[in-house]
Amino acid sequence: MIRSFRDKALRRFFQTADASKLSVPNAARIAVILRALAAATRPEHMNLPGLRFHALSGKDKGRFAVDASGNYRITFGWIENDATDVDLEDYH
């Protein structure tokens, strides 16, 4: 389950399928990633082909990321069985 979002446009897209405020063009891929994240019970469940799941380091240690589109990643934390602070960001 997804407990919280950092990105308002991403939350709106997840709740209503309104992609008008997303900063990336591939809304269909974002939707697939968010559905997988909502169904996951461990961060490692996001280690799916093509997503390049990885743990972050440095100031973002304890967070994880998957490829979304181009330089954009969906990043998230994890508490118990839930994703938290889900964000869409270009951190490169």
Regions found by a protein language model. Give the residues of each.
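Arg/Lys-rich, positively charged N-terminal/basic patches that mediate binding to nucleic acids
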Residues: 1-33
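Short histidine-centered beta-strand/loop micro-motifs
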Residues: 22-23, 55-57, 64-68, 77
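Short, solvent-exposed, low-complexity loop/linker segments
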Residues: 23-49
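N-terminal, well-ordered alpha-helical segments
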Residues: 32-35, 54, 74
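A short, surface-exposed loop/turn module that caps and links secondary-structure elements
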Residues: 41-64
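Enriched for short, Lys/Arg-rich terminal
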Residues: 65-92
